[in-house]
Regions:
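Von Willebrand factor
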Residues: 2-114, 116-120, 157-168
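Surface-exposed acidic, glycine-flexible loop patches that form ligand/cofactor-binding
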Residues: 1, 34-39, 98-113, 142-143
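VWA/integrin I-like adhesion module and closely mimicked acidic/polar interface patches used
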Residues: 123-173
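Conserved beta-strand scaffold positions in the cores of enzyme catalytic domains, especially
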Residues: 47, 151-153, 175-180
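C-terminal "exit" segments of structured domains
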Residues: 178-259
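Solvent-exposed loop/turn segments at secondary-structure junctions
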Residues: 13-17, 52-55, 84, 123-127, ...
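Loop/turn elements at helix/coil->beta-strand transitions in domains of secreted/extracellular proteins
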Residues: 40-45, 111-116, 146-152
C-alpha cells in the first residue's frame, strides 16, 4: 500500500529571501509533485511564513485534496513589504508553529504517514551568537524527534555558511538532513518519492550516497563538519549549550591560527 506524507514548509521571508520567490516556488513544486497523485487525497500540506522576531508567523494549512495552484497563491511574502535584511531569524517561533500543527499518524484510509518539516532560510537563528529569550529551536528539535517529525533544512545563499553546521545538526537531531538550496528540489523529490514508494523512513535514506548528491555544485561539505555535528547532538541540550559550543570552536580556530 505504501506510505504517504504530511508536510510543513517553513519559509523565511526576509527581503533577500523574498527576491528569490520564483525559484523558491519552483522548488516547492518539486516537493509537491513528488507525492504521487494517488496519495495526495490523504496528505496535508502546511505553510508557515515568518519574517522578523517581532512578527507572528503566518500559517496556512491545505487539507486534501492538494492543489498546486492554490498552494502557489499563498506563497508570497505576507508581512512587511520592505522586508528585514539584517539580523537573526526567529527559527524557534517558526518551529513552535510546526509543533502546533494537527499532525496525524495515519490518514483516513489507515495508511502510515511520514511527517516532514522543511525549513528554508538564509540567516542566523536567534540564540546562536547572542542570548535570546524566545522559543529554543534545539529543544524543539528534540520534541520533533519524540513525535516522529523529521526536519530538513534548506540553506540559501552564501551567508548561511557561517552556521550551516548548526542547521545540519538541528536537522540530524530529528533524523533529517541539511541541503544547499541549489540541490533542494532534486534531493527532496527523490527522497520523498523513495519513502512513499519503498515504505522506508527519512533516517534510512540518509546514506553516504545521499550526501554525495547533497554536496554537488555547492560549498557544503558534510565531512568538514561531521565531528562538530555529532558533538552538538551528543553534548548540547539547549541553544545556550550550542552558543557555548560555537564560542569555544571559534576560540580554538583563533588559537590554531596564531600557534
Amino acid at each position: 500500500m505504501g506510505n504517504t506524507i504530511d508536510t510543513a514548509m517553513c519559509l523565511d521571508w526576509t527581503s533577500l529571501m523574498a527576491l528569490r520567490i520564483s525559484s523558491i516556488k519552483e522548488k516547492i513544486r518539486y516537493v509537491f509533485n513528488a507525492v504521487p497523485i494517488n496519495k495526495r487525497d490523504g496528505a496535508r500540506f502546511s505553510v508557515i511564513q515568518f519574517q522578523t522576531p517581532d512578527d507572528q508567523p503566518v500559517i496556512t494549512t491545505m487539507v486534501p485534496p492538494l492543489n498546486i495552484h492554490a498552494l502557489e497563491q499563498i506563497l508570497a511574502p505576507p508581512l512587511r513589504q520592505q522586508g528585514y535584511i539584517d539580523g537573526n531569524r526567529d527559527i524557534g517561533a517558526a518551529l513552535r508553529e510546526v509543533m502546533n500543527l494537527p499532525w496525524r499518524d495515519t490518514d483516513e484510509n489507515g495508511v502510515f504517514l511520514e511527517k516532514l518539516a522543511v525549513l528554508v532560510t538564509d540567516g542566523v537563528p536567534c540564540g546562536l551568537f547572542d542570548a535570546f529569550n524566545g522559543d529554543d529551536p534545539w529543544e524543539i528539535s528534540n520534541e520533533m524527534c519524540n513525535q516522529g517529525i523529521t526536519l530538513i533544512v534548506v540553506g540559501v545563499g552564501e551567508s548561511i555558511t557561517q552556521c550551516d553546521d548548526f542547521y545540519c545538526a538541528l536537522a540530524h537531531n530529528t533524523g533529517g538532513f541539511y541541503i544547499p538550496f541549489i540541490n533542494a528540489d532534486r534531493i527532496l523529490s527523490s527522497v520523498i518519492g523513495t519513502i512513499i514508494h519503498d515504505q522506508t523512513t527519512f533516517n534510512q535514506v540518509r546514506t553516504h550516497d545521499l550526501y554525495e548528491e547533497i554536496e554537488k555544485n555547492s560549498l557544503f561539505k558534510y565531512s568538514y563538519m561531521e565531528s562538530r555535528v555529532k558533538c552538538m547532538i551528543h553534548e548540547c541540550q539547549t541553544m545556550n549549550d550550542i552558543r557555548r559550543f560555537f564560542y569555544n570552536h571559534r576560540l580554538s580556530i583563533q588559537h590554531d591560527a596564531h600557534s
